[in-house]
Amino acid sequence: MDVREVRVGLIPTGSELVPAGSLPGSGGAVESNTAVSAALLGEAGATCTRYGIVRDDPVLLREAIERGIRENDMLLISAGSSAGTRDFTAAVIAGLGEVLVHGIAMKPGLPAIVGRIDGKPVIGLPGYPIAALTAARELALPLLAAWGF
């Protein structure tokens, strides 16, 4: 019997973020969305890779997404999915592939993104932690289930 491993990459974005274990400065926040999403998807059978924090820069985000797509079967990008001046996720996904949905009638989680790059699903999670968890649960878990996980 062949057993296939599904690899999910998780990319946190945001210039205000610091890694867990660090003390954020004024206006900063500890990055937690990828840890929570990795735990959720890992329980479903995925092998998750959490990448380093990507600052709010479309060039850096593009490089991170290209790497994530090469190394994984599915990619989740945390934050940058809204319509602010530092939210580049949808534009970068569109430049590398296609955005299928941007904005879902789901609360919390409205600004979530569903896209595809090189035939692989890409999900843009909102930055707000409970919205990110909701989007991961409602969008990524069903994809894993459809793949048999």
PLM region descriptions:
Residues P24-A29, E66-R67, A91-A94, E138-P142:
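Short, solvent-exposed amphipathic alpha-helical segments in soluble enzyme
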Residues G45, I65, I69-N72, I93, ...:
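Structural signal for hydrophobic packing residues in well-ordered secondary-structure cores
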Residues A20, R86-F88, T134-A135:
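Short glycine-/acidic-enriched loop or helix-start segments at secondary-structure transitions
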Residues A94-F149:
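Flexible glycine/proline-rich
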